[in-house]
Amino acid sequence: MPINIVDSIGSVDDAIEKNEEIIEKIKAYGNKLFSTVDTSQCIDANTLISFEKGIEIGSANYYDKEIENSTPYIRVGNLLNNNYDTYCIDNDYKKCDYNDILIAFDGAPGRNSIGLCGVYSSGIYKVICDSKLKGFVYFYINSDLLQDIIKQNSQGTTILHASKSIKLFKMPSVNNIILNNQLNDLYNVLINLYKKQISLKKIKQLLLNKYFD
């Protein structure tokens, strides 16, 4: 049993845990900052943001591990842990980059994430907005203001659907430049931390593969 691999896996696990703690603290701070935004006069959110729905490629096109020329296929479950467990061959499907905001309206309405790169499924929408508003929009999406609207308009028994709630979204005006810049800075830090997290998980998997060879 190569003890150096075991030690390395433990060290990577520690780094993943520490990184996750930092992510949660930054998200909490960003949410606290956003809670200071004046919500007494909200505007139609659809004037500032839009949503691009992903595509279902079919399970016949899934790969359970990364192969040559493949790209991650992101499903609703991946938004929870920011991990990749399914891959596909890129055939000009709907794509997202690390700095895109992804949100689910089917299955787990309101669940969202950033820091993922690949092809995204039909249960997920990519948020389209001005890059200067990414931080504001991200923390708006995670606020009670929006999550409550999604929750109240989720329909279905076995699988919840909430895409019809999009037209009801109300968003505070972006009139505090300093606050907007602060939220954008936090957003960019989160993107880098999530990218680091994915890299650490890949390293861990490589070490595990080496250990079990």
Please provide the spans of the model-predicted regions:
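A short glycine-rich beta-alpha junction/loop motif
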Residues: 1-6, 119-125, 155-179, 185
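Non-catalytic DNA-recognition/assembly elements of restriction-modification systems
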Residues: 1-59, 73-81, 173-213
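Short alpha-helix capping/helix-loop boundary micro-motifs
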Residues: 85-92
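Glycine/Thr-rich phosphate-binding loops of Rossmann-like dinucleotide-binding domains
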Residues: 83-84, 112
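His/acidic/aromatic-lined binding-pocket segments of jelly-roll/cupin-type domains
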Residues: 93-94, 101-103, 169, 183-190
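Short coil/turn segments at secondary-structure boundaries
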Residues: 58-67, 151-154
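Glycine-rich catalytic cores of cysteine/serine-nucleophile enzymes that process amide/ester linkages
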Residues: 70
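A short beta-sheet element
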Residues: 92-146, 151-156, 160-165
